A protein has these predicted regions:
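Membrane-embedded beta-strand positions of outer-membrane beta-barrel proteins
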Residues: 38-42, 72, 93-95, 133-137, ...
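Transmembrane beta-strands of outer-membrane beta-barrel pores
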Residues: 42-48, 76-78, 97-103, 137-145, ...
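Extracellular loop and loop/strand-boundary signature of outer-membrane beta-barrel proteins
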Residues: 56-60, 102-105, 151-157, 192-199
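Conserved small/polar residues in nucleotide/adenosyl-binding loops
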Residues: 218-219
Length: 219
């Protein structure tokens, strides 16, 4: 009980900090509108076989090699003429929610993650193209955990709630005014930090593609 409360608290604190940044920006740069964004991501990835469960030692006796997830994200960034916009150019932050399928609902589940994220430009490649990074951190819910009687093969997940950590590197195309297309690669890790056993964890590596719509809103 205490373990999942800790994970939720960490996620809430991260989201609260992002909201506090937006509120503080509103107080200090009220003459400059924030840029708000709504985006969707689709991420097909490879399940790294770090445990025999993924190699085929499961109820179906079939290797598990793939996973997909869909993400809905809200972000904001500071106006380039504002104080924070000058300090942190090309930086964005926000909150996201994602749905994950590992194609084994009976043994692993189909978890939903809620997370804070932040990204920024690494380098500009052309007038419309840049190389960016983005990290996600939050909590994932809805896992099917190990049980010696009903889920005995699943040594990778020991709790119903697990931390979600992700790092990605993206090519960001400016398609048109207010529209961005992103493609790239990322790494993800799910675990409970050994607060419950077994906890081999779930690790993935793969691709991602996303579309973001940006708009200026005076608040």
């Amino acid at each position: 009980m205490k373990n999942w409360k800790v994970l939720i608290t960490i996620c809430v604190l991260g989201c609260t900090r992002i909201c506090a940044q937006e509120t503080g920006a509103n107080d200090t740069v009220s003459r400059h509108p924030l840029t708000h964004g709504v985006g969707i991501d689709f991420r097909p990835v490879y399940l790294i076989p770090t445990n025999e469960f993924f190699a085929g030692e499961n109820a179906a006796w079939q290797p598990l090699r793939k996973s997909v997830s869909a993400h809905l994200k809200y972000s904001f960034r500071f106006h380039p003429d504002s104080r924070y916009g000058k300090l942190y150019p090309h930086t964005y932050q926000g909150i996201g929610v994602s749905y994950h399928s590992f194609f084994d609902k009976a043994e692993i589940g189909t978890p939903v993650a809620v997370y804070a994220f932040q990204g920024a430009r690494i380098t500009r490649l052309s007038s419309r193209l840049s190389l960016d990074y983005e990290w996600n951190f939050g909590a994932s819910f809805g896992w099917k955990k190990y049980h010696p009687g009903t889920n005995a093969y699943n040594y990778v997940v020991g709790s119903k709630i697990n931390a979600y950590i992700n790092l990605g590197f993206l090519l960001n195309w400016q398609l048109a005014a207010g529209w961005q297309l992103t493609t790239g690669i990322d790494l993800s890790h799910f675990s409970n930090g050994n607060t419950q056993y077994p906890n081999a964890g779930v690790n993935t590596v793969g691709g991602r593609i996303g579309l973001v719509h940006l708009s200026l809103i005076h608040i």
